[in-house]
Amino acid sequence: MSIDLVPRQISLRWFLSLLERALAIVGLLTFVYFGGFDLSAISSHSMAPTLKGESLLQGDVILSERISYKFRQPRRWELIMFRDEEFYIQVMKRVVGLPGETVRLDDKTQTIFINGVPAPRPASLQGIRYLAYGNLTGGKGVSSDDGYYVLGDFSMDSQDSRWTGPVRPSQIMARPWLIVWPPSRVGFVNP
């Protein structure tokens, strides 16, 4: 009779050990996700072609990480996710001007000037055309004050700093990092 109990005890121990490991992994992943990451669906085309979206169900799904900006400030040309305080939504845009800088756009040459000096774009952004709308019209410079001047990559239809002003550091939530859906678009989002 004791011979029959041995396989059951081994089986139960093996199962409990497996369950313990599985729960530890799920707990760790839950902690990491809620502590450091965010999943967001893109529902507009204001950041196309970098991020695409037509509706909540037909847009890129983005994994953003919240850890980087606890240790460093956003860099020029990076994407940031921030809280729009007027509409209480999460928004993703590209950083063009850093705190204390003046941003100007030459609409003809597509050159962005920072404090009067041309700001070269990364090669991956050469095809993006920014339009001198809102506070960038007439070739005038706009101060980012103590915030970040952001633009949407699809400049023709983007609610960005040209209309709403700079993004305050306290509004920044995360750094969009990876397109995780759809499979045909999986990849990193920053240059």
Placement of each model-derived feature along the sequence:
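Soluble "head" domains of membrane/secretory-pathway proteins
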Residues: 2-23, 31-191
